[in-house]
């Protein structure tokens, strides 16, 4: 809420949310957007539901939190294929870290194309080349296929990739009040 407030936006102003996957560090605070349409990867949503509802021990849930998965939102839209979300915004499937994971490709007039792969690839070091398996991986084969897909998309669009967990890389990004156009 505090970050949105810095740009004059309230959670209720947001009508569409895209969750890359349902791990706690991405789905946390989804309760602030109960009024929104929430896009989530179908395979990950179903896997997370299974994890939290079939085993009562949270220590075995692997990054999924029951409270996040049970939030009643306006509508969950389960994604299982690539598509255009809005003009200039594409949703792409990048599984591996989790059974399903989605990223965004954002085409900007001034700053060009930016790819937000989220936990498909944590850092520049993991991206390589060569790509390196790291962190939590549900399916290592799908992980490496997703990295190759990212490389093709990066080349196709001459895109900049924003790594979701690369703290050194974060220092190079614009922050509020600056923004990308």
Where are the model-predicted features located?
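Active-site metal-binding motif and surrounding structural segment of the metallo-beta-lactamase
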Residues: 1-40
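Metallo-beta-lactamase
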Residues: 3-9, 13, 42-93, 141-158
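Hydrophobic/aromatic beta-strand patches that form the interior of the parallel beta-sheet core
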Residues: 18, 39, 77-79, 92, ...
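Active-site glycine- and acidic-residue-rich loops that bind
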Residues: 19, 90-104
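Active-site metal-binding loops of divalent metal-dependent hydrolases
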Residues: 22, 43-44, 97-98, 118-120, ...
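A short secondary-structure junction signal
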Residues: 29, 49-52, 102-105
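Short polar/acidic secondary-structure junctions
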Residues: 32, 83, 95-96, 107-109
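Cap/insert and terminal regions of metallo-dependent hydrolase folds
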Residues: 103-181
């Amino acid at each position: 809420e505090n970050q949105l407030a810095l740009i004059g936006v309230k959670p209720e102003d947001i009508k569409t949310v895209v969750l890359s996957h349902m791990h706690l560090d991405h789905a946390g605070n989804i309760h602030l957007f109960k009024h929104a349409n929430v896009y989530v990867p179908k395979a990950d949503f179903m896997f997370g539901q299974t994890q939290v509802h079939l085993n009562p021990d949270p220590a075995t849930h692997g990054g999924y939190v029951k409270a996040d998965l049970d939030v009643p939102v306006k509508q969950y839209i389960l994604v299982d294929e690539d598509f255009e979300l809005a003009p200039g915004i594409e949703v792409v499937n990048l599984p591996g870290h989790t059974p399903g994971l989605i990223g965004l490709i954002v085409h900007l007039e001034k700053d060009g194309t930016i790819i937000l792969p989220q936990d498909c690839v944590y850092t520049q070091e993991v991206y390589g080349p060569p790509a390196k398996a790291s962190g939590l991986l549900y399916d290592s084969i799908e992980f490496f296929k997703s990295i190759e897909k990212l490389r093709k998309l990066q080349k196709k669009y001459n895109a900049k990739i924003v790594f979701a967990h690369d703290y050194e890389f974060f220092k190079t990004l614009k922050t509020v009040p600056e923004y990308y156009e």
